[in-house]
Amino acid sequence: MESRYLQKCLGTCLTQGLTEVARVRPLDPIEYLAFWLYKHKENMNMEQMRQREMITLEHERELAMMEQEMLERLKAEELLFQQQLAFQLELEMQQKEKQKSEDFETGQEKSFKSMMSMESTARGEEQEPMQAEELVMDSGKTLAEISDRYGAPNLSRVEELDEPMLSDNGVSAPP
């Protein structure tokens, strides 16, 4: 038979089997061809299983790579988030420190101003003690009423009564 005819009509499997029978020349060519066809079919099934397995492995590898990439992205995002959080905390700490220093400076300025006003008040009281008393008397208000400070006592005015003046010379002890 012609090889082109066999390839065209019978297919490659039977053509290869007949070629193998012609090459080996067994005693029972039909039995040899039958075993060869079984073996060929088994080899084809194994090849298909291997290809399916390779496709499955490739798919699993792609899934693993995608999962690995996602984990890397999540780690990168987490690192970025931690850096942003650390930066934000650092900014807050700097703002708190700045606020504390500003509060401290304003406190110092206020205490300095109050000390200066106390000194000037003390100087003013030394020079004009009577004028301050006259201002308090004229206004009719107590020092607590004049003062706007929180916690200053709110006491009512008490009028002093004229009491007889006793001197040490005028009073003598009985003998």
UniProtKB/Swiss-Prot annotation:
Residues 94-112 have a biased composition (Basic and acidic residues). Residues 94-134, 152-175 are annotated as: Disordered. GO terms for biological process: epithelial cilium movement involved in extracellular fluid movement; flagellated sperm motility; mating. It is found in: Cytoplasm, Cytoskeleton, Flagellum axoneme. GO terms for cellular component: 9+2 motile cilium; extracellular region; radial spoke; Set1C/COMPASS complex; sperm flagellum. Keywords: Cell projection, Cilium, Cytoplasm, Cytoskeleton, Flagellum. Functions as part of axonemal radial spoke complexes that play an important part in the motility of sperm and cilia. Plays a crucial role during acrosome biogenesis. Belongs to the dpy-30 family. Component of the axonemal radial spoke complex 1 (RS1), at least composed of spoke head proteins RSPH1, RSPH3, RSPH9 and the cilia-specific component RSPH4A or sperm-specific component RSPH6A, spoke stalk proteins RSPH14, DNAJB13, DYDC1, ROPN1L and NME5, and the anchor protein IQUB. Interacts with SH3GL3. This is DPY30 domain-containing protein 1. It comes from Mus musculus.
